[in-house]
Amino acid sequence: MADDFGFFSSSESGAPEAAEEDPAAAFLAQQESEIAGIENDEGFGAPAGSQGGLAQPGPASGASEDMGATVNGDVFQEANGPADGYAAIAQADRLTQEPESIRKWREEQRKRLQELDAASKVMEQEWREKAKKDLEEWNQRQSEQVEKNKINNRIADKAFYQQPDADIIGYVASEEAFVKESKEETPGTEWEKVAQLCDFNPKSSKQCKDVSRLRSVLMSLKQTPLSR
């Protein structure tokens, strides 16, 4: 082996004293020179090219790795789809969640509205009771006032009819006659009583409606009542 080292070293250096050099250093130098020759020698271009060609699929393998990463990414995303969906929902909930101040304000507003509703119901009941009481009092006062008016009207009528000029005016006679006739129930005199309440004096006034036909009908009924 020493001779081999010496041969290689002698072939490299071409000096006879190269056999005395360190064999390890000579071996390392030989290996480095061979490696340099392999890299720079044109005779080995094709293998280098073939090696480069073998190394060429590197980007393809990288692309396949990228594709695999993409596929794996899709698979990973699909596998973690529910988790990502839950995360998105949670994020949306956080975004749509009301702030604490608004939540407190809304709660206070709700309590305030409930208190107002309760107070309004109590007030409505009080107003109903008060209105019912006022209506009863008004009905009572109205009834008392009606009775007082009746009594006062009777007194006024009695005093009026006792006047000395009452007969001249004709109120008493007409009143008594009307009352007397109204109490009498004689068959066939109904239209006569109706005719007594009507004014058959013709009046030529533009503001009054023409009731001549009605007047003539009443007169005919008074003269010839309807036969039953």
Swiss-Prot record:
Question: Phosphoserine-modified residues are where?
Answer: 11, 13, 216
Q: What is stated as this protein's family in its record?
A: Belongs to the clathrin light chain family.
Q: Kindly state which keywords UniProt assigns to this record, in alphabetical order.
A: Acetylation, Calcium, Coated pit, Cytoplasmic vesicle, Disulfide bond, Membrane, Phosphoprotein
The gene name reads: CLTB
Q: What is the official name of this protein in its record?
A: Clathrin light chain B
Do the record's keywords include Transferase? Answer: no
User: List-wise, which residues carry Phosphothreonine?
Assistant: 186
Name the source organism.
Bos taurus
Q: Bias regions of kind Low complexity — which residues? A: 1-17
